[in-house]
Design a protein with these regions (language model features):
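An interfacial alpha-helical scaffold signature
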Residues: 1-195
Length: 195
């Protein structure tokens, strides 16, 4: 995770716009494109960061940094992990006022996260062992406002794990075939009946 990094996801933003334009029944091709881009993307997640400060006044995000990610609670009580697609969207969020304004902790500092980080954050039980009640992820809240429920995060994660397992099995199969234990004959090899 990097602190206050410049991030841009033009393909993901484009696919999000396609899905929004699709309305209530998104095109399956757009959904598949969204899942692919989601997996490739780096996001900016609001965070309260406790870290040592370097000589230049910047926080040092090394192994000793602690992050607290604020959770956005909707009017219906559902809790969301918030991420932004790019720095321009964070700046828009910082400039918002009124009912759509995010609390200050959502727009102060950001760290980069990948989808796999987000999945771990919302699918892992709380430190005390209780169920994590986060409903899902919201991308660009009060703007594009794309919601990815926890069950979809779990499905995408399981799909990625299945694909990785299939790739490993394919590689293992190729290696098993190429590691034929029979001896390759060459002059002077006594195992092949040559003297």
């Amino acid at each position: 995770m990097e602190l206050n990094k410049t991030v841009s996801n033009p393909m993901l933003v484009g696919v999000m716009q396609l899905i929004k334009a699709d309305g209530k029944t998104p095109d399956p091709k757009h959904q598949e494109m969204f899942m692919e881009e989601l997996d490739k993307a780096e996001f900016l997640a609001p965070a309260e960061i406790k870290a040592e400060v370097g000589p230049d006044g910047e926080k040092l995000v090394n192994g000793k940094a602690q992050f607290r990610f604020p959770i956005l609670t909707g009017a219906d009580g559902r809790r969301f992990f918030v991420v932004f697609t790019d720095n321009a969207t964070v700046e828009k969020a910082q400039a918002m006022e009124g009912a759509s304004a995010l609390p200050e902790e959502f727009v102060k500092e950001t760290v980069t996260v990948k989808f796999s980080d987000l999945a771990r954050f919302i699918l892992t039980p709380n430190p005390d062992g209780s169920e994590n009640t986060t409903y899902g992820i919201v991308i660009n809240p009060f703007m594009e406002n794309i919601v990815i429920p926890k069950n979809l995060v779990a499905a995408v994660t399981m799909r990625k794990q299945k694909e990785a397992k299939e790739k490993l099995e394919k590689v293992a199969s190729v290696l098993a075939k190429s590691a034929d234990p029979k001896v390759i004959p060459f002059p002077g090899n006594k195992d092949e009946g040559q003297d």
